[in-house]
Each structure stands twice: as structure tokens, then as C-alpha cells.
Amino acid sequence: MSLDISKYPILALANTPDELRSLPKESLPALCDELRTYLLNSVSKTSGHLASGLGVVELTVALHYVYNTPFDQLIWDVGHQAYPHKILTGRREQLSTIRQKDGLHPFPWRGESEYDVLSVGHSSTSISAALGLAICAEKEQENRKIVSVIGDGAITAGMAFEALNHAGDIHPDMLVVLNDNEMSISENVGALNNQLARVLSGSLYTSIREGGKKVLSGTPTIKELLKRTEEHLKGMVVPGTMFEELGFNYIGPVDGHDVNELVRTLKNMRNLKGPQFLHIMTKKGKGYEPAEKDPISYHGVPKFDPSNTSLPKSSGGKPTFSAVFGDFLCDMAKEDSKLMAITPAMREGSGMVRFSKEYPNQYFDAAIAEQHAVTLASGMAIAGYNPIVAIYSTFLQRGYDQLIHDVAIMDLPVMFAIDRAGLVGADGQTHQGAFDISFMRCIPNMVIMTPSDENECRQMLYTGHKHTGPSAVRYPRGSATGIQVNNEMQALEIGKGRLLRETKVTEKGERVAILNFGTFLANSLEAAEKLDATVADMRFAKPLDEALICELVTNHDVLVTIEENAISGGAGSGVIEFLMKNRLVKPVLQLGLPDEFIAQGTQEEMHTELKLDANGIEQQIRDYLDL
């Protein structure tokens, strides 16, 4: 249910950027106040990403006020901060549906709006895409302006610097806005810097700067002296030398919460030639005190009451798989001083907060740098240590070459604790962990484990930690099953599954064996009760329990594989490959994720829609058997 827009009289006049640009600039501060309040009141009722959006309200207003969007193209990196952008681009009334099934996408999405130039979700892609757009805009002579907005976390990734380096080399007309909300680059914000930004972005300074370069082009010594003098003057108050050396004209830092100052600076910069870099300072969670004090907790929020000073606590009960992993880390570190835990900027999400505090010398946050994180682990393994890389399934995709080249080829003992495997829910297509079994199963030396519950997860983590080669344990987002966890840890036999239920059906053609990989086990068992089917918990997607498969083939008419991974190339495909190699001809029904990018919705909604809940599994098997 959308909010009553009559309570936001200025925002009501700015449903699109064209309407926004018709407003007098004097009304912009009040518009920002209303936009921030609207965002807070909306997200608190629906859940979603909050703190990032609160921090870029003024920037969003200023960009759409100065630039002729959608003709001028604006790209948001990652997209957590794009809620104000959605509100101002005709989607205000739909904001209450964000991250819900059939609702607004959680991130900028090309299929949703002409104002969303790039579909995003993963970090550090915006500058590369903006550069591609800028190159083509120049070739078409369209006088189209291209802007990329990237955060101080995302810009640390190698891909961002690769794009900056390329842009600085070929010199297209484009603007990169660095939204610095962690004070990690500079604390120089204030009147002096705002004044300097106006001067450095102004036409007089620019014409003198460019004209001087032409005049002095034949006198390199004097030209170099002038360049160094300029750098010295700018360096006294700005940290932009690095970006200048990459070939950008650096402006800033500027107060990112002074909308009129941003408008003035952006107007100056809009017509500058070559690659421009605007550094703004913002506060994540701006305007809502609890979010300002704890931006990490308020990054993604459940439904809550904004009048309370804290978020609602979870009801307890079943632990999450992430918490099971975090407990394992702490317990294992007591015994193993050579355990090294690595995460690419996912400490909270991966359940590593306690470990990072109790074992700070064994904890390494590699930032948003998955490639580096994987090869960092390989170096530790070569040195005789026992690294564990905690990473989301969707982000392991970004370190795939390193997984092969720097870990598997050398058969190094690196364990990957793969969180968010399978469907993640509200974050949609970019975050589904749909492909990890498929892309790891083809790598030699890999061991891939698929725990069915939290106790299995704990034992498999121990198994991987003790294994002498590369291994992976994949587990889903959210709560585990609630069973009693065995604190004593024991390594499982690699490649051995377990038979949990045997059919009593004797009628030929109807004897079904379900081969379960992962946390759909409860659904498989429930369906099996109605079908009187055999159920095997396979445990390992690689290596497969070939002896168990042979036994099931001998005694059953149909095999059914089930996994929360893409059917293409998944564990079920591995079963079929084994059968064909050994001339074991048997009908196999593969259940799993279809050959499509799956949109957002709750995990339960998507499991039901894809017929992977107990009823859906039963029905798919009955349809296959034509019962």
C-alpha cells in the first residue's frame, strides 16, 4: 500500500525528472527532506535497503535536476542506493512492492524503466559500462552525457580501477561520482572545499588550465612545473592525486548533503571535456539517527517502526546456516591456530562477526575483491596454513578463474564455505545462488558437499577443513531445520551418501528412488511418504557415491534427482553422465532450478512456483510416471 502523497506536497510535484527540473532550485532542500521522509516511511513498512538510499537523497535530486535523463544516462553501481532514483522516475506509487514477487526490482533494472540504463546487483561494474556508453556516444556525436555513481566500497574492486585506468587513457567525456560515506578517503569537507570545487569545476579555471597547456606545450619544463604547482595547491586540500594520475580531472571532496552546492558543481562539470571525477562526502543513513549510528544494521531492514530506536529482534528459534558456520569457525579456531578465515566484505552476512572479534589475527576481510580473496587463500595454503573462504554463491562467480588457476590446479587445501546457495529470495536475479554446483563440478580435484541440515553442515565444514585438497560446502540463506547439532566433529567419508528411506513398492514401473542433494531433503522425504519412494541423501555432488547409484539403479525403475541449483550441469547431470558412461540405462527425472534467471520473491513463494516444495515434487514425479 503506497503512502498518502498529499503529506509530501513538493514531492508530489516531482513524479518524473521532467517535473523535478521544472521546480525552482529554492525548493530543492525541502524536496530532499520530503523524499528522505517518504523513503523512510515506505521502507519501514515493506522492508528493504534503507541506509544507502537515505545517504544519496541530495545527490539523486541534483543529478536528475542537472542532467537531462533519460537522454543523459545515469548508472548506479550495485543499486542499493537507488530507491530515491526509483521514486523520482515514475515508480513512487510502486515502491511499496519493492523486492516482492511481481513487484519493483530491488536494484536498477533495464526492463523496468528507461531511466535504468544498466541492470545491476553486483558491485564495481558501473564505470566500465559508463565508459562503453561514453565511447559510443562520442561516435554517434549525440552530445549525450554519461554519469556513473559508485561508492567508496565498490571502487576498491579491481574492476573499477581497470575501468578508471582505461578511461584515463582514452579520455572520453564522462563523469564518475564517488559517493564516499565511510570517511575512508578524506575528511576534508567544508566551506573551503566547496569553494575550491566551484573554482576547479568552473569555466574560467578550465579554460585557463587547457589554454595554458596549449601555450606551454613546447616548453615541457615550465609545463611540468605548472602541473606540479597545480597538484600541490590541490593536494593541500583534496586527496585526488591518484585519480589525477589516472587521467581524470578530480573535483572535491564536496558536501554530498548540500543539494544546491551539488547542483552548482554538477552544472559546472556537465560541459567539461574528458573524464571527470567528482568526490562527494555523505553519511549513510542521513536524516534518521538510528541509521546514522548503525548503518550496517540499517543497510537492509525488516519491517520496523521508525519511532523506535532499534530494529525488531528476530524471534530466535532455529539458527541460520550462517550462524552454524560462524560457530564452527570459532570452535575450530580453538584447536587450529593455522585456520585463516577470509571474506570479501561479507562479515555480517556470512556469520563471522564473533569470529572476527575473538580471533582478529586469523580473520581477513579482503574487501569487495573476490579474485584477490581466492588467491590470497591459495598463498596461505602454500605457506602451510588452513584457509577458509566464506563467500556467497553469486559472488564466487567473480573469482572463478582464481578457483581454477590458483587453487584447483595446485590441488591446494582451500575450503569454500558457500553461503546463499540456491534461491535467496528478495534480491532477485543477480543474487540467486543457482550455478555453483554446475561451475565447480567440472573442475578437477574439487570436492563439493551439499548438507541437508545444520548438523550435516557442521560435519561437512569439518570434513572440508581436514581435506587435503580444494573443497566446497554449499548451504542456503536463512534458517536451518532446528535439529540438535552434534558439537563433536567427525570427518565424513568423501563421496559417500546415505540411504534414508526404502520403498516397499513391488509393482514394476513404479519403483522410484529420489537422490537428494542438499536442503530439499525434508521436502523429498515428505513427497516420498506419499509416493512410497526410496530416498538417498547423496551428500556429495562431487565425487558422487557411485556404488549407491548402482544399487539404486538395480532396484528401481525411475531415478529422481533434486537440487537447489540449475538443472543444466548440476548434480543430476553428473548422475546421468555416470549412468551413460557405465551403460546403465534408466529414466532419470531431474528436478532443480530451470534454465532462466529467477526473479525476486520469498524463498517459499519461489519454491512453490517452481514445484520444489513437497507437493510440487510429488506432483512432478506423478506426472513423469503418468500416474
From Swiss-Prot:
Enzymatic reactions: D-glyceraldehyde 3-phosphate + pyruvate + H(+) = 1-deoxy-D-xylulose 5-phosphate + CO2
Signal peptide: none
Cofactor note: Binds 1 Mg(2+) ion per subunit.
Keyword Acetylation recorded: no
Pfam families, alphabetized: DXP_synthase_N, Transket_pyr, Transketolase_C
Biochemical pathway: Metabolic intermediate biosynthesis; 1-deoxy-D-xylulose 5-phosphate biosynthesis; 1-deoxy-D-xylulose 5-phosphate from D-glyceraldehyde 3-phosphate and pyruvate: step 1/1
Keywords: Isoprene biosynthesis, Magnesium, Metal-binding, Thiamine biosynthesis, Thiamine pyrophosphate, Transferase
EC number(s) recorded for this UniProt protein: 2.2.1.7
Classification via SMART domains: Transket_pyr (SM00861)
Listed InterPro entries: Dxylulose-5-P_synthase, THDP-binding, Transketo_C/PFOR_II, Transketolase-like_Pyr-bd, Transketolase_BS, Transketolase_C, Transketolase_CS
Any one GO molecular-function label of the UniProt entry: magnesium ion binding
GO term, biological process aspect, one: thiamine biosynthetic process
EC top class, as a word: transferase
GO cellular component: cytosol
Binding residue positions for Mg(2+): 152, 181
UniProt similarity note: Belongs to the transketolase family. DXPS subfamily.
Entry-linked HAMAP family: DXP_synth (MF_00315)
PANTHER family, alphabetized: 1-D-DEOXYXYLULOSE 5-PHOSPHATE SYNTHASE-RELATED, 1-DEOXY-D-XYLULOSE-5-PHOSPHATE SYNTHASE, CHLOROPLASTIC
Subunit composition and interactions: Homodimer.
Known role: Catalyzes the acyloin condensation reaction between C atoms 2 and 3 of pyruvate and glyceraldehyde 3-phosphate to yield 1-deoxy-D-xylulose-5-phosphate (DXP).
Protein name, as recorded: 1-deoxy-D-xylulose-5-phosphate synthase
Lineage: Bacteria, Pseudomonadati, Pseudomonadota, Gammaproteobacteria, Vibrionales
